[in-house]
C-alpha cells in the first residue's frame, strides 16, 4: 500500500475507479488496517459446495514441486527397412 501511496504522489493525473470517480489514496491508506483481512469471514456463494481441506496429495505426488506426474509413454520399435540393391551399371 505504501508503494501505491508513493506512486500516486508522483503522478499528476489522479487515479480513478471504474465509474470514473477520483480515488483519494491518502484517505484509503489511512482507513486500511492490516488486521481487517484476517478477521473477515469467508462467504460461500454455493452453500452446497463443501470445503476441502488442504492435503499433501493435492500436489500431484511430486513432493510439493508443483509438477504433474507425466504419463508413461510406450513406444514401439521402428520396422526394419529392406535393403535396396543398387545396380551400378545403370546411368
From Swiss-Prot:
Q: Which domain of life is it from?
A: Viruses
Q: Which residues form a coiled coil?
A: none
The UniProt record lists the keyword Membrane: yes
Predominant place of localization: virion
Lipid-linked residues (N-myristoyl glycine): 2
In its record, the post-translational modification comment is: Myristoylation and palmitoylation (probably on one or more of the nearby cysteines at the N-terminus) enable membrane-binding and Golgi apparatus-specific targeting and are essential for efficient packaging.
Q: Where in the cell is it found?
A: Virion tegument; Virion membrane; Host cell membrane; Host Golgi apparatus membrane
Start and end residues of each stretch annotated as Disordered: 48-81
UniProt keyword annotations, A-Z: Host cell membrane, Host Golgi apparatus, Host membrane, Lipoprotein, Membrane, Myristate, Palmitate, Phosphoprotein, Virion, Virion tegument
GO cellular component terms attached to this protein's record = host cell Golgi membrane; host cell plasma membrane; membrane; viral tegument; virion membrane
Question: Per the record, where are the segments of Acidic residues compositional bias?
Answer: 52-62
- Provide the membrane topology annotation: Lipid-anchor
A Gene Ontology biological process annotation? viral budding from Golgi membrane
Family named by the database record: Belongs to the herpesviridae cytoplasmic envelopment protein 3 family.
Quaternary structure and partners? Interacts with cytoplasmic envelopment protein 2; this interaction is essential for the proper localization of each protein to the assembly complex and thus for the production of infectious virus.
Protein purpose = Plays an important role in the cytoplasmic envelopment of tegument proteins and capsids during the assembly and egress processes. Also participates in viral entry at the fusion step probably by regulating the core fusion machinery.
Name the UniProt record assigns to this protein: Cytoplasmic envelopment protein 3
Originating organism: Equine herpesvirus 2 (strain 86/87)
Q: Which gene encodes it?
A: 38
Amino acid at each position: 500500500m505504501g508503494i501505491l501511496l508513493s506512486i500516486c504522489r508522483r503522478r499528476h493525473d489522479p487515479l480513478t475507479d471504474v465509474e470514473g470517480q477520483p480515488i483519494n489514496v491518502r484517505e484509503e491508506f489511512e482507513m486500511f488496517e492490516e488486521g481487517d483481512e484476517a478477521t473477515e469471514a469467508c462467504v460461500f456463494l454455493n452453500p452446497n459446495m463443501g470445503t476441502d481441506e488442504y492435503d499433501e496429495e493435492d500436489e500431484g505426488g511430486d513432493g510439493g514441486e508443483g509438477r504433474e506426474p507425466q504419463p508413461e509413454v510406450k513406444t514401439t520399435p521402428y520396422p526394419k527397412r529392406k535393403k535396396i540393391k543398387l545396380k551400378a551399371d545403370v546411368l
